[in-house]
A protein has these predicted regions:
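Short secondary-structure boundary/capping segments
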Residues: 77-81, 95-96, 197-199
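Flexible hinge/capping segments at coil-to-helix
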Residues: 89-104, 118, 122
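Short beta-strand-centered segments that line the small-molecule binding cleft or hinge
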Residues: 47-88
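Small-molecule-sensing regulatory modules
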Residues: 1-54, 113, 117-367
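Glycine-rich nucleotide phosphate-binding loop and flanking beta-alpha elements
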Residues: 65-70, 112, 171-172
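Short coil/turn connectors at secondary-structure junctions
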Residues: 72, 98-102, 161
Length: 367
């Protein structure tokens, strides 16, 4: 590409999704080797029209903006490396050490259930609950999305709440002084065997959107194929779920080195995981080379006392089939756990007599 040629990358002010900050850093990094010009527009609708008009070449947006706007005639050229999709607790103490009955604000139903699983004693409130309790409904009504969370941090500092749970990008974007405690994907055995928090799908992605026909090869050095694969698999999972399940299902897909899985399996003495990675045609201890795709999915009942979860590790070339099988297994498990079991006359050798008795369902998704 000649020096006179440049690419105009469109963006919008922060939308609490991390996109604005990431594209700015990406332009700063890759702009050292080619002419990239960042242009900020006031609204996503304006940015989309500017892209269609040909005034810009690329528009950076979140997965939620892509699915929530009219993108006819546009396509996804690729994705930047995925940012951490986990949510965080903004509080003085880790979730394990919050006082009994501490007040924590959380708007997302999945995170509320996951937090109840960990700390059933906490008082979980919504922003509306806090506003009503503090007689501040009028104050909240006049705020936009950029003002809500700084106000919530003020309430925490004043002792009106003990903490609040937000996407990591919200904490980073507002430069909050409060300590950030990651609600992580891995079970933390150092913190009273803390349960993992599988996040709501599609967080942390930055899509580079272009007009159809844009030469993707011209920006290939900016793109992360593993992030694109994870995005497409998480999107497929979300689209296949019943709409009633989407707000209460956590799903996460990531490509990782096989050494990462081996280290995890060794630390947790996970013989099943070790066995699944062994090449049966070679001596034990010699594993198939290459990365793996890890897929996790879970949902909980409202009180957080019962969890339905599945996970699968596959090679990249088998990722779509792996996703289909993961969902099939998850939905079958969910069906069994949410169905009352009728009494049966069938007697299975080795099973206790109570096996034939009627039994209630293991979980209700709406109690």
């Amino acid at each position: 590409m000649e020096k006179s040629e440049y690419l105009v990358i469109l963006t919008t002010p922060s939308r609490n999704d991390g996109v604005r900050l990431q594209i700015e850093r990406a332009v700063g990094t890759h702009g050292k080797h080619r002419d990239l010009r960042l242009k900020q527009l006031p609204h996503m609708e304006t940015a989309l029209q500017t892209l269609r008009d040909g005034t810009g070449d690329i528009l950076a947006m979140s997965a939620f903006d892509w699915h929530g706007n009219d993108v006819d005639g546009l396509s996804i050229a690729g994705l930047l490396p995925r940012k951490e999709p986990t949510w965080v607790l903004v509080a003085d103490d880790k979730p394990e050490y919050l006082e009994q009955g501490a007040r924590v604000v959380c708007e997302h139903e999945l995170l509320r259930r996951q937090m109840r699983r960990m700390r059933p004693d906490l008082v979980l409130e919504t922003i509306e609950d806090v506003a009503a309790r503090l007689k501040a409904k009028g104050t909240i009504a006049d705020m936009d999305d950029e003002e809500i969370w700084p106000w919530m941090e003020e309430q925490r500092l004043e002792g009106n709440i003990d903490g609040f749970i937000v996407p990591r990008a919200v904490h980073a974007g507002h430069r909050m002084k409060g300590r950030r405690h990651t609600l992580g994907l891995q079970r933390d055995q150092t913190e009273n065997n803390r349960e993992r928090f599988i996040p709501p799908p599609l967080h942390g992605f930055t899509l580079l959107v272009t007009r159809q026909g844009f030469p993707k090869a011209s920006i290939v050095e900016m793109l992360d194929p593993s992030a694109e694969l994870a995005y497409r698999l998480e999107t497929a999972i979300l689209e296949r779920l019943d709409p009633s399940l989407r707000p209460i299902v956590g799903a996460y897909v990531e490509q990782r080195k096989i050494s990462t899985f081996l280290k995890k399996a060794t630390q947790e003495n996970d013989e099943a995981l070790l066995t699944s990675l062994v090449d049966p045609n070679k001596k034990r201890g010699v594993f198939k080379s290459g990365p793996r795709i890890e897929m996790l999915i879970e949902t909980l009942n409202p009180s957080g006392t019962v969890t339905a979860a599945c996970e699968r590790i596959v090679q990249p070339e088998n990722s779509h089939l792996g996703m289909v099988n993961l969902l099939k297994e998850f939905m079958e498990l969910l069906s069994v756990m949410t169905t009352d079991h009728e009494a049966t006359k069938r007697n299975i050798i080795g099973m206790p007599a109570s096996f034939m008795d009627a039994s209630p369902r293991l979980m209700d998704l709406d109690e």
